[in-house]
Amino acid sequence: MQRPSGRAPEQLRDVTITRQFTRHAEGSVLVCFGDTKVICTASVEAGVPRFLKGQGQGWITAEYGMLPRSTGSRMGREAARGKQGGRTVEIQRLIGRSLRAAVDLTALGEHSIVIDCDVIQADGGTRTASITGALVALVDAIRYLQREKMITTDPLVHMVAAVSVGIYEGVPVLDLDYPEDSNAETDMNMVMTEEGGLIEIQGTAEKKPFTDEQFAGMFSLAKKGVAELVALQKAALAQ
């Protein structure tokens, strides 16, 4: 089996995480998984949604979007249509769930952090890149809250990252790009903590069912990939 990119089955794309990418947001990151590039910002807002008022805890939510020419042909803006698509809603909810699992919301106090993930170029794995980059932006927003003495303890409980795995030409592979994703027999996204705890698994057999053995192979690759991504997150945060 030869991957279109020439990578080994267990090999991530080249991943870079650039912090402080924009001026205004409390946390901002440009994350690149190969040719997939996403800007992730984390904005601190006073207060929490109405359903949390008076409960002494914070909130993290996310929005996700793709620039019209982030793909091979131009997509119309969802804002121009006046309605978000189902895929967009699904992905931004996934990002929010994943990041809330990384923190102790009570330690945030009654503050909200809004994550915005904007895909500027797509080549597969935009949701996993978004989660991985957004975690770093979130940490920078938390550091802002600590510097400004708006919170007294660190709410971060887990480092969290996400990666795609799949079955391509019968072989489990890590971090699918678009040519693989569009031809994979199975496509799966896994969100995990640094310790290997599972936050979410999204998987679909596209052409034929996958076996227990194949799932175990994909799970093993995902754990390896997440460990490498967390190391990159930590390296970025240490700069």
UniProtKB/Swiss-Prot annotation:
Any one biological process term the GO annotation gives: tRNA processing
Pfam families on file: RNase_PH (PF01138), RNase_PH_C (PF03725)
Single GO term (MF): 3'-5'-RNA exonuclease activity
Enzyme type, top EC level: transferase
InterPro entries in alphabetical order: ExoRNase_PH_dom1, ExoRNase_PH_dom2, ExoRNase_PH_dom2_sf, PNPase/RNase_PH_dom_sf, Ribosomal_Su5_D2-typ_SF, RNase_PH, RNase_PH_bac-type, RNase_PH_CS
EC number: 2.7.7.56
Record key words, sorted: Nucleotidyltransferase, RNA-binding, rRNA processing, Transferase, tRNA processing, tRNA-binding
Catalysed reactions, as listed in the record: tRNA(n+1) + phosphate = tRNA(n) + a ribonucleoside 5'-diphosphate
NCBIfam families to which the protein is assigned, alphabetical: RNasePH
HAMAP family: RNase_PH (MF_00564)
Family label: Belongs to the RNase PH family.
Record-given protein name: Ribonuclease PH
Lineage of the organism: Bacteria, Pseudomonadati, Pseudomonadota, Gammaproteobacteria, Cellvibrionales
